[in-house]
């Protein structure tokens, strides 16, 4: 068998389908030969063994000396201890019961009013996971209304507070931070808490924490008597937290089926434990990534779900794939600069945008098409003008147009989008990421680059405080004056700090020209 993208035999030979999951996976439009597949099958013997060790509780995040246990969340019986399994089941039951009490009105605010909204404060996976849940699954007029603060953009925070101004008293404030020390959710939390208190609105009795036991956030929520604290286990990373409290609480508050979501993820986990390469969808999917990128991530992943409800999925995968696989070193300490860049939006919108380049421009990508076979139960569509059939036609047409130019793609087909299938889809990509990491000998569960970024940001914040304090004391200062007091290597950061602090601010007198940083002299004139 050759690498022909349009080979019917290849399509039939590599099409995967599972009747319990009702999911299809087609990797036939990836360039590979039967010999290449055979070589990978041999490698997967070790991959399967490594994943088994991870699931059994091996220390997988070496930097933080912790296990990686998101697979246990959907099947507590495989967790390494009965205590962990019992805690997982208790957390699920607690969230389910809490959701029912909120939606039924058994738990109300201090004015005996039923809750109407949720303001979710979390960053990274703590924001993207819940956003994916609500955007994909929430039905009109069902459950609470969700708003998100996933950044410290002052306009975002002020706009959300303005949008909710009439409903803040009936809003649940959910703060997600495993350690409680992540600056972005902490800052947003403090701003909103202060706003509530300054306007005689309740915060403590409306606030919910999702965090580790004993964390800074846990202690704060406990001491201030917040409405509820849900557990976020040490062995759950942010990008794989969607089957933890982080994803289950949104499901409960939009009145969706937690059990079905977990069942879908669990069944996909079980299916991808099969050691038969061609019957393991995560093995096939990760192999396609490996082969199309020559094992070094030479091609970007373009995610195109042909359903609006899955538009957030490309952003979700961007974090899952890039944070997991973007690594400088392999496990042997060698510099490898691994990774797969991910972007995408939705079909058929993208056919009128960057698909032009995908077909006719630089060949540095592969597409992942995601299609759904269901359509809404309604009589508003004419049989001759059914949008579902048009959408399917657009997908198949784009796929065909790409392959005619030898542009590679993968197609995943779901029977329908619901809690069960979304759980399965997420688990499929989680497993594929783990498998790919094993193939290229990197650790998918550490994030030294993220930690380096956090440390650098903390240094800048420290300089911001030093500069502010210096200017408060009075006197005129040039950038050279300031760096000579602190560190001569930070001239550029000091310029950025001064620009953010002083430009357009009447409290500061600025002499010189902003286009010539060395000419600037700044003095605080109003306190």
UniProtKB/Swiss-Prot annotation:
Keywords: Cytoplasm, Gluconeogenesis, Glycolysis, Isomerase. The active site is at residues 323, 352, 454. Pfam families: PGI (PF00342). Its EC number is 5.3.1.9. It catalyses: alpha-D-glucose 6-phosphate = beta-D-fructose 6-phosphate. One of its GO terms (cellular component) is cytosol. It is found in: Cytoplasm. The keyword Phosphoprotein does not apply. It is an enzyme of class 5 (isomerase). The keyword Membrane does not apply. Pathway: Carbohydrate biosynthesis; gluconeogenesis; Carbohydrate degradation; glycolysis; D-glyceraldehyde 3-phosphate and glycerone phosphate from D-glucose: step 2/4. InterPro entries: G6P_Isomerase, Phosphoglucose_isomerase_CS, SIS_dom_sf, SIS_PGI_1, SIS_PGI_2. GO terms for molecular function: carbohydrate derivative binding; glucose-6-phosphate isomerase activity; monosaccharide binding. Its main location: cytoplasm. One of its GO terms (biological process) is gluconeogenesis. Catalyzes the reversible isomerization of glucose-6-phosphate to fructose-6-phosphate. Belongs to the GPI family. This is Glucose-6-phosphate isomerase.
């Amino acid at each position: 068998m050759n690498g022909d993208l349009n080979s019917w035999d290849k399509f039939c030979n590599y099409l995967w389908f599972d009747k319990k999951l009702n999911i299809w996976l087609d990797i036939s439009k990836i360039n590979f030969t039967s010999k290449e597949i055979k070589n990978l099958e041999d490698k997967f013997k070790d991959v399967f063994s490594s994943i088994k060790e991870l699931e059994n509780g091996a220390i997988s995040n070496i930097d933080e000396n912790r296990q990686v246990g998101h697979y246990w969340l959907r099947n507590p019986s495989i967790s390494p201890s009965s205590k962990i399994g019992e805690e997982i089941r208790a957390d699920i039951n607690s969230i389910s019961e809490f959701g029912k009490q909120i939606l039924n009105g058994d738990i109300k605010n201090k004015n005996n009013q039923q809750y109407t909204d949720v303001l979710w404060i979390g960053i990274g996976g703590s924001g993207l996971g819940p956003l994916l849940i609500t955007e994909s699954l929430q039905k009109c007029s069902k459950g609470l209304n969700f708003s998100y603060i996933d950044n410290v953009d002052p306009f975002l925070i002020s706009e959300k507070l303005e949008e909710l101004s009439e409903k803040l008293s009936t809003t649940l404030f959910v703060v997600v931070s495993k350690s409680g020390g992540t600056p972005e959710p902490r800052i947003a939390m403090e701003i909103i808490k202060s706003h509530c208190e300054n306007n005689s609105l309740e915060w403590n009795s409306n606030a919910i924490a999702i965090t580790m036991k004993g964390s800074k956030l846990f202690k704060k929520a406990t001491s201030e008597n917040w409405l509820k604290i849900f557990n976020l286990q040490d062995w759950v990373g942010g990008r794989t937290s969607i089957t933890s409290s982080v994803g289950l609480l949104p499901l409960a508050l939009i009145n969706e089926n937690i059990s079905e979501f977990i069942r879908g993820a669990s069944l996909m986990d079980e299916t991808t434990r099969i050691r038969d390469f061609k019957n393991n969808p995560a093995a096939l999917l990760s192999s396609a990534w490996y082969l199309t990128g020559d094992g070094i991530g030479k091609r970007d992943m373009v995610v195109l779900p042909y359903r609006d409800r899955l538009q957030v999925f490309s952003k979700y995968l961007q974090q899952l794939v890039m944070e997991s696989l973007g690594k400088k070193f392999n496990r042997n300490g060698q510099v490898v600069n691994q990774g797969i860049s991910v972007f995408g939006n939705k079909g058929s919108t993208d056919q009128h945008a960057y698909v032009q380049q995908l077909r006719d421009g630089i060949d540095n990508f592969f597409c992942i098409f995601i299609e759904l076979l269901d359509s809404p139960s309604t009589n508003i569509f004419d049989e001759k003008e059914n949008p579902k059939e048009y959408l399917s036609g657009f997908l198949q047409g784009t796929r065909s147009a790409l392959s005619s130019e030898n542009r590679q793609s993968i197609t995943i087909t779901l029977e329908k989008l619901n809690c069960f299938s979304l759980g399965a889809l997420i688990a499929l990509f989680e497993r594929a990421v783990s498998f790919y990491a094993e193939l290229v000998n990197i650790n998918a569960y550490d994030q030294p680059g993220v930690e380096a970024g956090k440390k650098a940001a903390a240094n800048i914040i420290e300089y911001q405080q030093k500069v502010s304090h210096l200017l408060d004391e009075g006197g005129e200062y040039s950038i050279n004056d300031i760096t000579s007091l602190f560190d001569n290597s930070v001239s550029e950061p000091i310029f950025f700090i001064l620009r953010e602090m002083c430009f357009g601010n009447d409290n500061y007198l600025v002499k010189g020209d902003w286009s010539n940083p060395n000419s600037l002299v700044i003095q605080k004139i109003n306190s």
